[in-house]
Structures are given as structure tokens and as C-alpha cells.
Amino acid sequence: MKGYRTARAVGWIFRFVFTLLVFAVVGLVIWRIFLSAKIPKSVRYLQPNEVLSAAYEANDGNLTFRRQEQTSITRGEKNNGYFSVVDCVFIPEAEQVQIVFRYNNSTIRHLAADYGLEKIPEKSETLFDVTLLRTTDLTPDDTSDNGDPSTLSSERIYPTSANRAESSLYTFYRFVFDGVRIEDDTDGVFADVYYLGALDYSDVPYGALCLYASGDKWLSRPLSAGDKKVLEG
């Protein structure tokens, strides 16, 4: 009887220790993912340039910072989860847009498979071209035909600057785009992603995310203490 109780106690201790280890491992994985997903400090805050600084000074620091609630991660059949925009701000007084663009390490593996590359590119390589596509409604009095490409014109806007940062699981870029005007006939603004090794703007982008859609509600984008610090510089 004594041996039975001892064996039972040992079994209980073993199960307890095993369960504890499982929870510890799961907790460590979740914590690692959380830390990796957090925007690194070097790209977390607004990136002032001459355009933004001039607008900030001209308006006595009273700038509008806004965004829209749009899908922040690609959900297409061929790019599901590949790319995301984890921060976006429109600053109309400066005619500027800033975004934080992010992709996972697994996206690089998918890239190699999708484009038939001989080997998986190094994480440190610059792999993607990111631009904005601004579409304008040529028939603003009739929005029912906006699904017809012939009723829209488009303008591609290239980044003024790009700052890069990495975590263990992700690669981040803060892109600054100047000359982005949202007017009454602006139909949409999209972040287009192309693989640099096969860059052709006439092709469908590898990934695309809507940043602005005509008629959708604007939301205030609060400034963090870090944003205010760099603006007041």
C-alpha cells in the first residue's frame, strides 16, 4: 500500500512538472511573438522631414493626423497574411502619408516558392518595392461606375524615405510619401507591393492594401509622446 501511494505521488508530481513545462513553453512562445510583433523604436514614431517640419511650423503645431479603418493585412488567395500595414497616418496640411509596413519571415519563404527562386533570399536583403497608388474618379457625379477601370485615373507615388528595422520574426519599414492629396474626386489610396526581382507596374501587385476609400469615415490618429518629441525636435 505504501509503495502504491509513493508511485501515485511520483506520478502526480511528474504530471504537474510536465504541465508546468508545457505552460512555460507556450508562454515563452506567445511572449516571443508579442515582442517580435511590437514595432521597433527606430520606426515606431513619425519621421519628420523638411516637408512635415515646414507644415508643422506654418500651422503652429496644429496639424491634422488621421487614418481610416481599413483591412491591415493582405487576405488574397495568393498572398494571405504576407504583408500588413501596422500604422498609417494621413497629414493633409503637409500632403504627406506615413506608413509602417511589415512582413513575416514566412513571407520570404513564400516569395521563393511563388517566384521559383533557386534559394530563399536572406532576410537582410531589400526584397520589395512599396509605392502608393492614388485613384481619381473621372466621373465624380456617378459613383456607380467606379468598378470600371476606364472611369478612374491613377497616379503612382514613390516614397521620399524608407527606414528599416527587424525583430526575430518580422521586417519593418517606415515609409514617408510626400505629395499625397485627398481631394473630392479621390477614389482611393492603396499601398502596392511588388517583388523587386520582377518589378513591373503594369502587372498586378504581389500585395495591395487600401489605406483610403472615398466615403469611408476618417478617424483621429492620436500622437504618442514619442511622436510629439520628434516633431518638436
Say what each PLM segment does.
Residues 1-12:
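N-terminal Lys/Arg-rich, disordered targeting/topogenic segments
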Residues 15-23, 27-233:
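Alpha-helical, hydrophobic structural elements that either
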